[in-house]
Amino acid sequence: MIYEDELRQMHALVDRARAAGVDAVIASDLSAILYARRIGMEVHISTQCNLTNSEAVKFFSQWADVVVLARELSLDQIGRIARAIDEQQICGPSGDPVRIEMFAHGALCMAVSGKCYLSLHETGCSANRGACRQICRRKYTLTDVETGAQLAAEGQYLLSPKDLCTIDFLDRFIGAGVRVLKIEGRARGAEYVLSLI
């Protein structure tokens, strides 16, 4: 999400990325997508766009050769989208079929991709603007407000699913049509990412 008074800052940031030799930007805000394309930068459509079907992929294909599908999709759903890309010849600006990018490792959000407001509500930092404070990954207890009784729950990480780890079924990811693998890096140190490669 980029607000009106942030457009110049976004332009300057994308300009600096291009000048530094960055290959592509990952974006969800249409202003960033359009500006990056206007200055000749490749765009990858972010998971924040919550792409869950081939019509959404077709819409964004006018600006991007790579789309990051929503993390909530099953392998079957990813496969159906990949087949639709092939069957309908959904191509990006390069003229090649759009490539599907998926997270191969990292945190799973307890909310729908691009729709979490917990961090904003609790800390004033919006996950939808790349500033998630991962409030969901803290330990919590579940209490019945009417009786005060603590309810039984497995573990204390009630809002935090286990991290995504696809190493044991990368072949199924690739078989479903995933062409680009993504490792979560935001809010992680370089050592974390290095240990996974």
Summary of predicted features, one role per range:
Residues 1-51, 55, 68, 76-78, ...:
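Active-site pocket-lining/capping segments in soluble small-molecule metabolic enzymes
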Residues 65:
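Anion-binding and metal-coordination hotspots
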